[in-house]
Amino acid sequence: MLYSLFYFLSSLNVPGARLFRYISFRSVLSFSLSLIISVLIGERIIRFLQRHQAGETIRNLGLEGQIQKKGTPTMGGIIIIIAILIPVLLLARLSNIYVLLMLITTIWLGILGLIDDCIKVIWKHKEGLSGKIKIIAQVGLGLIVGLIVYLSPNIVMYENVEIRQQGGRKTVSYTPPLKSTQTTVPFFKNNNLDYRDLTAFMTNHRTAATWILFVLITVFIVTAVSNGANLTDGLDGLTAGSSAIIGVVLGILAYVSANLGFAAYLNIMYIPGCGELTVFASAFVGACMGFLWHNAFPAQVFMGDIGSLTLGGIIAVFAIIIHKELLLPMLCGIFFTESLSVMIQVAYFKYSKRKTGMGKRIFKMTPIHHHFQKGGSEEVNVIIQKPLNAIPESKIVVRFWLIGILLAALTVVTLKIR
């Protein structure tokens, strides 16, 4: 909205209006505005949730400080969503297909999470939406994103970007714009993997098979990352802080992918138009950081499924549309580890019960952040006993953030490793 207004004013040579043409300027504004919005509206939304008794139901799992959380308002993810949408609607180019995809993702998963939280908190059905309905909604979003990336003529990229310096002149060369199924992967030749290579056995209809594979991978990633963020949301500030760290890296990747010079230097695909996503990423980071104002230990509000499902879905779709989705296992290492710990725990328990008649566990409790939170006696049916003493919640969260920062730095660094 404001972008269109100031673009018009700049054509009339109004002083200062040209600043809005710069993505960097609008990104700084977007971050600042989302941070301020999430801090200021947070108190009002928390009071509203308290008045309507939208408190979290806490199961007693024997964790330190758990009972004190009883009655803390949930559904605070509304704060994050509002703080993302307002700056993006004001400052981003709303005609940009990448921005539109991110708005669809935010609203789609926000509605899904809101329904789930309302069922659990307001209508007092603690199970919420059934897992099948959640998966169907996430798969539906993945299909929409994958098909739009495939069908939209506005989503193209330039491969093999090179900038040569000859004397005082620079020569830029790249392939013609094309619909590409390439994605960035560290340690591969030219840092790229083409999904087309995985369908080489399809002599007929290879192009169609490649795009079907891409859409299926999109569906899987959206579902996996969204649920991974949901599992991570068990400690005050953990998901919001981790998401902010991831958002910074995604914003950087979008910016360099839309810049010919950086794309050539890093040997990654040049994706015209995706630089506008930097404005969205800035709002995303600002909203998460502003939410921490209320959600840091001890939390005044929990984000609920409306927050965690939305944050995970945003991260997944963002990475997919800038063709960096295979960097997510490293970048989202915290989410990945949380999900993996649950799968390992369940699989080993079933295996050991079938084998010995007594189910054994790898961890004291999953997701894995609860393993560190739970101290106490040495149980014979738990393989990993350490730490024997419970680690304070705030210390676990900060340590996970530090690991997230390390993984984020490694993700960026790997772009230059051949």
UniProtKB/Swiss-Prot annotation:
The chain crosses the membrane at residues 22-42, 72-92, 95-115, 135-155, 208-228, 244-264, 277-297, 302-322, 326-346, 395-415. Its main location: membrane. PROSITE patterns: MRAY_1 (PS01347), MRAY_2 (PS01348). It catalyses: UDP-N-acetyl-alpha-D-muramoyl-L-alanyl-gamma-D-glutamyl-meso-2,6-diaminopimeloyl-D-alanyl-D-alanine + di-trans,octa-cis-undecaprenyl phosphate = di-trans,octa-cis-undecaprenyl diphospho-N-acetyl-alpha-D-muramoyl-L-alanyl-D-glutamyl-meso-2,6-diaminopimeloyl-D-alanyl-D-alanine + UMP. Its cofactor is Mg(2+). It is an enzyme of class 2 (transferase). One of its GO terms (cellular component) is plasma membrane. Keywords: Cell cycle, Cell division, Cell inner membrane, Cell membrane, Cell shape, Cell wall biogenesis/degradation, Magnesium, Membrane, Metal-binding, Peptidoglycan synthesis, Transferase, Transmembrane, Transmembrane helix. InterPro entries: Glycosyl_transferase_4, PNAcMuramoyl-5peptid_Trfase, PNAcMuramoyl-5peptid_Trfase_CS. It is found in: Cell inner membrane. Its EC number is 2.7.8.13. It is a multi-pass membrane protein. GO terms for biological process: cell division; cell wall organization; peptidoglycan biosynthetic process; regulation of cell shape. Pathway: Cell wall biogenesis; peptidoglycan biosynthesis. GO terms for molecular function: metal ion binding; phospho-N-acetylmuramoyl-pentapeptide-transferase activity; UDP-N-acetylmuramoyl-L-alanyl-D-glutamyl-meso-2,6-diaminopimelyl-D-alanyl-D-alanine:undecaprenyl-phosphate transferase activity. Belongs to the glycosyltransferase 4 family. MraY subfamily. HAMAP family: MraY. Catalyzes the initial step of the lipid cycle reactions in the biosynthesis of the cell wall peptidoglycan: transfers peptidoglycan precursor phospho-MurNAc-pentapeptide from UDP-MurNAc-pentapeptide onto the lipid carrier undecaprenyl phosphate, yielding undecaprenyl-pyrophosphoryl-MurNAc-pentapeptide, known as lipid I. This is Phospho-N-acetylmuramoyl-pentapeptide-transferase.
